[in-house]
Amino acid sequence: SGITNSFPKWTIQGGTGRAVAMLQDPSQRGVIIEQLEQGKDVACLTLGDPTIYSTYIYIHRIVKAHGYATEIINGIPSFCAVSAKLQDSLVDRSEQLHIIPSTYDIEAALELPGTKVLMKAASKMPLVKATLKEKHMTGTMIENCGMPEEHIYHKIDEIPERASYYSIIVVKEGNHD
C-alpha cells in the first residue's frame, strides 16, 4: 500500500559506527522495531549489494536478534557496475580478484596477484595515488558510478586528491583484449 513512513537518513559522513550506535539506541531502533511490532513490513534500500561493506547488515542483524524474520535481496555490487560501465571484465580465465577496502594496507594490497578493486578509496586518495605511481601501476577510477555525478578517470594523474565516498579504483594486471 505504498510507503507510509520513512526512517532517519544515516549519512555517509557519520559512518558505519554512527549507524550502529543509532541502532543500539532504543529511541532510534524503535523506528524500525515499532513498525514491525505493528505488523508492518519494513524494507531498507541501499546502494550496491547489502552484503558488501553495507551499513544495512547491522540493521539486519539487530532486527533478526529481536526475533523478526529477515530477508536479504541481493543487489548489483558496485564493483560489478563499474566493470560493466568500463565495458571490460574484472578478471579473465584463472586470474584472481581482490576486493579491498581503503582501510586495508594499500601497499600490501597492491602486491596481491590479479585484479585489485579498491573500495571506498576516497578516504586515502593521496596515499593510493602515490603508491600506484611509485609501483608504476595503472588503474581506472569511477566516481559515483551510475549516478548523475558519475565521472571516469582513466589515468592516475587525472584522479582528484579529494573524491566522492563512492569512488572505486580498478587496478588490473596484464592485458584484457
What are the residue ranges of the model-derived segments?
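Class I S-adenosyl-L-methionine
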Residues: S1-Y68, D157-I159, S167-I168, K172-H176
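General beta-strand structural signal in soluble alpha/beta enzymes
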Residues: C44-T46, I72-G75, M141-I142
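Short acidic active-site motifs
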Residues: Q28-V31, Y104-A108, L127
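A contiguous loop/helix-start segment that scaffolds small-molecule binding in enzyme catalytic cores
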Residues: V42, L110-D177
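Generic secondary-structure signature for well-ordered alpha-helical cores
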Residues: G30-E37, A69, D88-V91, K133-T138, ...
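Class I SAM-dependent methyltransferase SAM-binding "motif I" and its flanking Rossmann-like core
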Residues: T51-L112, P160, G174
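Short, surface-exposed amphipathic charged segments that create phosphate/polyanion-binding patches used
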Residues: R18-P26, K85-D88, E111-T115, Y153-I159
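Short, charged, surface-exposed secondary-structure boundary motifs
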Residues: G15-A19, A81-S83, P101, L127, ...
